[in-house]
Amino acid sequence: MSDAELIEKFLKGDISAFNSLIGRWEKRLYNFILRYLGNRDEAKDLCQETFIRAYRNLKFLRDPQKFSTWMHQIALNTCRDHLKKCQRRNTFSLNGFHNPEETAANPEIEMEKTTVSDPDMAAQNRDARELLNKALQSIPEEQRVVIIMKEYQGLKFTEIAGALDISVNTAKSRMYYGLSALKKVFDQWDIDREKIIYEM
């Protein structure tokens, strides 16, 4: 059953249909929020808050076919509201790096990372994630968001544009400049980008 069909059932009074939407979207939104905030506990809380907001406002969604864009927009606004409330800078955990012209990474990313048996390899992975986290914090938030949505959520530029209320060209521009900025950071730090990706 499609999201649109579940939404129709929910709006007719079938609460279980919304539970089905949660089951379908919880993992994906959790990973989006986790990469935006970099904190697992906060990600869990804000994922729940996102669904609460969606539950209250689903009746106002004009086009059920745009449910994906709508949910990401709610999740992003929930994160931003949280950061304003906390009055602190957000951190990011992004464990990959791709050219914007390449195919987007699989959006279904595991909530927990694969266990690494080799202690040395595990330490290298932690160091790589830390470096990527710091690099992401050095670029503008608007660019980070587009990178997360495109590379890790698998959204199309049209969907990203809708969620952020910007043009498609602006979304592509932010993606390009964000990736370019990250490359410059790695060059400045004399970091082998390919090695970091391999170790993730």
List PLM regions with ranges:
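Arg/Lys-rich amphipathic alpha helix in sigma70-family domain 2
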Residues: 59-63, 76-94
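Structural recognition of an alpha-helix C-terminal capping motif at a helix-to-coil junction
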Residues: 31, 45-52, 66-77
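Sigma70-family region 2
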Residues: 11-12, 51-66, 85-86
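Acidic, proline/glycine-rich intrinsically disordered inter-domain spacer in sigma factors
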Residues: 100-134
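Helix-turn-helix DNA-binding module
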Residues: 4, 133-170
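C-terminal edge and immediately downstream basic/flexible tail or linker adjoining helix-turn-helix-like DNA-binding
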Residues: 9, 90-98, 131, 138, ...
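Short, charged helix-capping/linker segments at alpha-helix termini
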Residues: 11-20, 30-49, 61, 163, ...
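N-terminal module of bacterial RNA polymerase sigma factors
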Residues: 1-28, 35, 120, 137, ...
